Amino acid sequence: MGITSRLKVMSFLQYFIWGSWLVTLGSYMINTLDFTGANVGMVYSSKGLAAIIMPGIMGIIADKWLRAERAYMLCHLVCAGALLYATTVTDPQTMFWVMLVNAMAYMPTIALSNSVSYSCLAKAGQDPVTSFPPVRVFGTIGFIVAMWTVSLMGLELSSAQLYIASGASLLLALYALTLPKIPVAEKKANTTLVSKLGLDAFVLFKNPRMAIFFLFAMMLGAVLQITNVFGNPFLHDFARNPEFADSFVVKYPSILLSVSQMAEVGFILTIPFFLKRFGIKTVMLMSMLAWTLRFGFFAFGDPSPFGFVLLLLSMIVYGCAFDFFNISGSVFVEQEVDSSIRASAQGLFMTMVNGVGAWIGSLLSGMAVDYFSIDGVKDWQTIWLVFAAYALALAVIFALFFKYQHHPEKLSLSTKSLAH
């Protein structure tokens, strides 16, 4: 098997693990373990905490002691153990700590899998810019296949989803042993601990425009996890209505939600056109408005014929909502920041979105779900409208306060480096 095919298998398993539980664990905890919305939000906040803590620490470990593929293997072994133990947990506090251990091991593997891919492709004489995207798309395929597997097997409300994820983690840990050796990076002279942890980019907060950008990245990051956490439980709740109890939406909610991941692939292809034609600020605004539509369609969607169309539209606009901010935000950082701290700035952007923002969003969204619940019955329409109003308010404030001048010729140079 050629190196490209081997990396595709790695990418497939990397995201198959996540897809096995990320979208459905909330439903398992609410419906089977009887957790509250706040409990579920707390458990999912572990992902945000891990995204804040682990990348810098793992970077130091990989730099000093471990080759990338060995660090990758050890992380997935820890994931396998944590996910296996999670199948036995029935209280929210223990579940939080177990899933925090899992997240602290899993989150660094995303960057490590990219590093392994780039190194192997370069060693094989291939251009990572053109060769990596076809490898990475197998990750999205793996995520979707996992969602379909759990849904079609009727495991969305069962701890069996965690057994599947644990088994896939163990398989990937063993598979990592077969990957080519990645040499430890050469030590850079006079590299401070601050630089190793990526903290030197915090100087950017002295720039008002960058400070506003990172603040909005954090606030938008708060909405990214909401539908991962509560989208599946929302669809399962239609089972309370006898009219919808046997509907496709109730039986296979993850299959419906997987349309969101399919839409991501499609919208990624449109980003270069929209960035060059409209500029970064407009594309980021499109993302915020798409989040408003995502939640708004959820508020009025249901398994009826018209309601199903609204749910389907919600899945489609998710691709725009998710991709347009993440990609255009990364391009903005690439374009605006000095090359000496560009990598740290990209790390800070991801930390604000997937770390601080996701952590805050998971906790507050869980509280909001409980606030609009009476005797365990959730007022989903109000819940989604509140989230839609938040996204719309962000869009309006962003349009007013974020100043940006579109320069297509400058942008075209930046988008070329984005593939790295």
Residue ranges and their predicted role:
Residues 1-48, 209-245, 252, 326:
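Helix-loop boundary and gating motifs at the non-cytosolic
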Residues 6, 85-89, 169-181, 355, ...:
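Multi-pass alpha-helical transporter architecture, strongest
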